[in-house]
Amino acid sequence: VQDMPVQEVAQLKEKIQQVDHVESVLWYDSVADLSIPMELLPDKLYNEFNTDDATMLAVFFDSATSEDVTMDAIREIRSIAGKQCFVSGMSALVTDLKDLCEQEEPIYVALAVACACAAMMLLLDGWLVPFVFLASIGMAIVYNLGSNFFLGEISYITKALSAVLQLAVTMDYSIFLWHSYNEQRELYSDNKEAMAVAISKTLTSVLGSSITTIAGFISLCFMSFTLGRDLGIVMAKGVLLGVLGCVTVLPSLILVLDKPLQKTKHRSLIPDMGKFANGVIKLFPAFLILFLALIYPAYNGYAKANSEVYYDMGQCLPEDINYVVSIRKLQEEFGIASTHMVLVDADTPSKSVRDMVSEMEKVEGVKYALGMESLVGCRIPDEAIPDFAREKLESGNWKLMLINSEYKVASDAVGRQVEDLNAILKRYDPQGMLIGEAPCMKDMIDTTGHDFQ
């Protein structure tokens, strides 16, 4: 929160606490009454949560990071807070990413349709043919999206990608049927008979390729990273429905529109490929040698590209989107790039917790670790801490600590930092947990790394 008087910040905090699924909000008045100057806080606590013109609030939800209700809460907090406030964190990232996908999905689907339509109008032999193809595939896409109802839910990433992927993967089947039908029309006087033969030949041609495509998508279901299963099931369904549409819906459309389709035919812009084919046959040893020679640099390029894969989804977002602006502001004002949370057994002795915090603060890149012990400075006795604050940092089973880091989420540096912090934590509490954006992304990196191998 920037450039806001203390009393207004307190009012803002109260409004945020009223948002559905906000479990609690921690700020200065969670520790002491506003009549007590903030400077009486322990120096460590004051300096890390305040700058000359900004202060931080910690918001906790009673729902999961990516739940719809959490994202609704993020949107409501932003609307309440206004332009003086910047909301960061994993939930804010997921909210912005989902909103961006939903906002841009109609745009890139429309672009895909327009590009496919333009290419087919020029490279196929009919002006009306592309629209018939798109109508048939559009029906298959709607059937596929509708049948996702039986899955219960799908990832917004799968939803954003599936329509365009299905269009790209299944378009060839329609082209096969069209060419086969035109060939059979020259052999049969009855269009229906010609279409029946064309369907038979098309099925023979596309069955093998579609089965291998479906098998490829189903293989994604065996990934440890369950987004693969989500995408694999949806796309396998999409290919199957695309094949069924190609031999049921599309033939019906072609037969109904046969006259206008034939009247709007034109010469294809694709030149005769006979000379090229003859040249390939004559020079096939040279092509074989060329491709063998390219294997080594291609493998090196593959290895280099896979070693530089990035996992920070924030890098995918525009610079002016809320999350990116907020995380940049947090870095500029407080030097914080990511936040971890530590849960330790509530029965862990206070001395052990203090020793653990001391060790964690020595880990490279850790800006500070903050827990109940940090709130108890020499000027604030333990009994002066409000029960509300104690309840939020200590429950019946756990003690909560916040660790702020100078390292960005999903970076190699924060990965090493998470490993070091986990090692320290397990020495003091084998059942303790390190959670947050960076630990989550590290788990995802480890999981997908295993899948990629």
Explain the meaning of each model-derived region:
Residues 65-309, 409, 416, 426-453:
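Membrane-embedded transmembrane helical bundles of large multi-pass transporters/channels
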Residues 1-94, 309, 314-453:
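Structured non-transmembrane domains adjacent to transmembrane bundles in polytopic membrane proteins
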